[in-house]
């Protein structure tokens, strides 16, 4: 027997049930028991965050920098700013601006933003306090910690951005290729 007149040979779209707070999906796709729907987060997942390589008050880990920061914090800040800005802000410019703000008591407003950028770049916690508080209350300690952190990540703030780039290029050129064998 044939089809009744007026019906086509097209398949009807099937309705799929989705899990929502108001309905439950069973293993066979129908409404019923709740299904084990993955959320994308493993059961034993713990979000980890990198830690600062040194504590806030570990200034004597780099005593030379500690003395420079105590005498002329604008120098340390300028070095940090040049590295964090990837050379866009020269050390002297950042240092002079910091120095001018230092005498008004507002240098922390400028400097804490660089701490926040360092934290973001290296995935560091906002510790021991929010960046602006750390810079307001413990400015020289914060600058020393940031300087040490940059060194920990392979930067030499004394060289500036261009010096670090040049040093990295020289090291790259001197690194022997891996995975090659001698033929012969």
Swiss-Prot record:
Stretch list, region Disordered: 1-33
Transmembrane annotation, as ranges: 94-114
Entry function: May be involved in heavy metals transport.
InterPro entries in the record: PLAC_motif_containing
Coiled coil regions, renumbered to chain: none
Family the entry assigns: Belongs to the cornifelin family.
Taxonomic superkingdom: Eukaryota
Biased composition (Polar residues): 1-26
Species: Arabidopsis thaliana
Protein's membrane topology: Single-pass membrane protein
One Gene Ontology cellular component: membrane
Compartments, as annotated in UniProt: Membrane
Protein name: Protein PLANT CADMIUM RESISTANCE 5
UniProt xrefs under NCBIfam families: A_thal_Cys_rich
Keyword hit for Transmembrane helix: yes
Alphabetical keyword list: Membrane, Transmembrane, Transmembrane helix
